[in-house]
Amino acid sequence: EATARMNTARRTLHGKLISQMDLRRVDVRNMSEESLRQSTQSLIAEILNNDSSIAPDIDKARLAKDLLNEVVGLGPLEDLLADPSISEIMVNRFDEIYVERKGRLTKVDIAFSTDHAVLGAIERIVAPIGRRIDESSPMVDARLKDGSRVNAVIPPLALKGCNITIRKFSKNKLIDQDMINYGSATKDMMRFLEIAVEQAANIVIS
């Protein structure tokens, strides 16, 4: 329930923040990343101080951080990207996000405020590499600064809403015991592959 209230507050304030930026004619394209962050941070603080509709039990510091990440960063994906235990992130729509940990897929209790916010995150991913995504080109592949692979799909190709899949690169190399622990392979399977490699046999993976 607390998460639902936080998400509702974030959606409401996200709309107000975007409206204020539009009214003030903030041209984000001509601003440095640091200038945009500082300007947005000040505007968020102003909105939070003047908005009496925010429930008293809402963590305003967390709300401000979430709003800032959503406008100038990758929204709720920022914390997921910083989590070393997560190997893959899948956004099926703005409020449906899954992560993979140790080979197991689970739904996380976080969300973007709107589908438009997901699109904004995608645009911030592809803009630095000179790519674009729109209705005429609704799918794009890219990489984050850390090398993580990104695939993004938007309507009309995506039916439920904007999709993002991020495959992170683990700092620790995967070994055969990891595959066994994750349930991806058995000891016999790994031993068979080891023998096949030792014998320089042809291996077909399909």
Language model: regions and residue ranges:
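N-terminal anchoring/assembly modules that precede and organize ATP-driven motor systems
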Residues: 1-106
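P-loop NTP-binding catalytic core
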Residues: 83, 91, 96-201
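Hydrophobic anchor at the beta1->P-loop junction of P-loop NTPases
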Residues: 205
